[in-house]
């Protein structure tokens, strides 16, 4: 936690919106993407710069708030949900306090910012090695797949080999999934372009299901710009993932269980626990209830989005109460929802802590 300073984080945060908005606006003006024909999504879409700004800000704000909300519970509930009678604190000043005393909690965000900064310096065609060197030499702490990839890069194993399971035992972990937000926020309404960005950057630290998690999250963010229907965003984004993959099958199960148990997220959690709670890759989780695998944790993101029904608190709370990586999961869910709804629609209760660090 002491390897990234608050000053560095705040400096990077100030450049974020400028870069993201400029990139997104440029992509909109120079790229046209043909989506799979569907009755669910518009074939053309127009968005004002004001609305674009509101959605981009919403994505980053939602992610930051979600991390802070779930932070106190992170990996304290392993293969166990957080029961309703257990309070989850969102104390006054908590985000500022985390910024000062536990900035490593925000690895979801400062990894995104590193990649954004590379785009700013080198443009949208920046080579993959530039992203790899940027985070490998950055002065902040890393864990699991990110840490293993850093070690690989510093020892001459460059991407995509740095993220491959032969060189990285954490290849299926959640790492790129929690830092892929930028890919969707920079490609509004263009999930295929978001996936292209993820193909380049996501393989620095992940492969297989770990990579699919980031592709899926990025696609949901991208589609959040052109659809206000959470069910459509969740289902259409899944088309970016191979149907025969374990990741796709799990997310599809969650969607089906939501239809079967529309008012009972805990039943869906139990079904998911029985069928999908195996972490066979991460050395820390193989023989323990600890599970940092991208599959189960992304299932918790989807559960929050579907059962949250557009309510900011409910969405975060469900993703958090599913347990395991319970700060990253509400961060993803809240970020996607706030991209759909916009920064201006985040309830004041959640904004007051964020404003202290804006």
Segments (PLM) and residue ranges:
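Catalytic phosphate/nucleotide-handling subdomain of diverse soluble enzymes
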Residues: 65, 69-71, 76-89, 205-209, ...
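Bacterial Sec-dependent N-terminal signal peptides
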Residues: 1-40
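Beta-strand segments within the central parallel beta-sheet cores of soluble alpha/beta enzyme folds
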Residues: 128-136, 195-200, 232-239, 315-320, ...
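Active-site cavity-forming subdomains of large catalytic enzyme subunits
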Residues: 53, 61, 111, 116-215, ...
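Accessory "access/gating" subregions that flank catalytic or transport cores
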Residues: 47, 153, 162-171, 182-190, ...
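Active-site-surrounding "flap" and adjacent substrate/cofactor-binding loops of secreted or lumenal enzymes
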Residues: 72-103, 109-112, 129-135, 139-143
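Helix-termini ("caps") and immediately adjacent flexible loops/tails
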Residues: 38-53, 85, 97-98, 106-108, ...
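Mature N-terminal segment immediately following signal peptide/propeptide cleavage
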Residues: 47-70
